[in-house]
């Protein structure tokens, strides 16, 4: 499938940092992170194909399609070498891009993503996908909330929970299911060792699907990485705790050679 001319936004100045959101999300999920980085980095956030303001080509999509979209955007904007940070599915797109285009990749942030899944991990994802296909995405939204956010955040910020759920509702069902299956079936274990650039691996202590065990595996497979586990958090780190993600991401990025 041909690359899609995705909707994007650029803020800041300095070395280019491309920010890649996850399933059923939007480029706006990075807003608070961008506010803390745009003094030193040219922050490029974009909507994945089929999401937000980007075109909606016919499904199914593949991980390679999503990599092609990122490469097309890099070429369009003319950045030779870029940092990439991705969340969840975006945390798979980033290292996969770095593997395909090592010359153009300065570093990768893998936030709340997964590799080295066990048979039980894969079975749980299969069950979630099957439930969405059989019962509809709307019927599973309640289970997503419990996976994505802590109980305290759910109680304190119902408007933010509803806004995130509305993003899911506004994503075409075939797109949401399609990118879920990309996330569920992608296994980075066979090739993570090929990603040679510096990497930040970060997740929440209580993220069920992208848990510390899986991120410790990622950290161990990458030749040059650091691991951060944020205590008490689940999956939606940028919504619930961008103030805790930002210092680690900023420190990591500033330490890289940006010449």
Question: What name fits each language-model region?
Answer:
Residues 233-242, 246:
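Catalytic histidine-centered segment of alpha/beta-hydrolase-like enzymes
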Residues 7-59:
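Conserved HGGG/HGGXW glycine-rich cap/lid loop of the alpha/beta-hydrolase fold
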Residues 116-123, 135-194:
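Conserved alpha/beta-hydrolase catalytic His-Asp/Glu region
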Residues 64-81:
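Conserved acidic catalytic loop of the alpha/beta-hydrolase fold
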Residues 195, 201-203:
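Short beta-strand/loop motif that positions the catalytic acidic residue
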Residues 205-210:
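Acidic catalytic loop of the alpha/beta-hydrolase fold
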Residues 95-100, 104-139:
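Flexible "cap/lid" loop of the alpha/beta hydrolase fold
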Residues 1-18, 38-42, 79, 226, ...:
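Alpha/beta-hydrolase fold catalytic core
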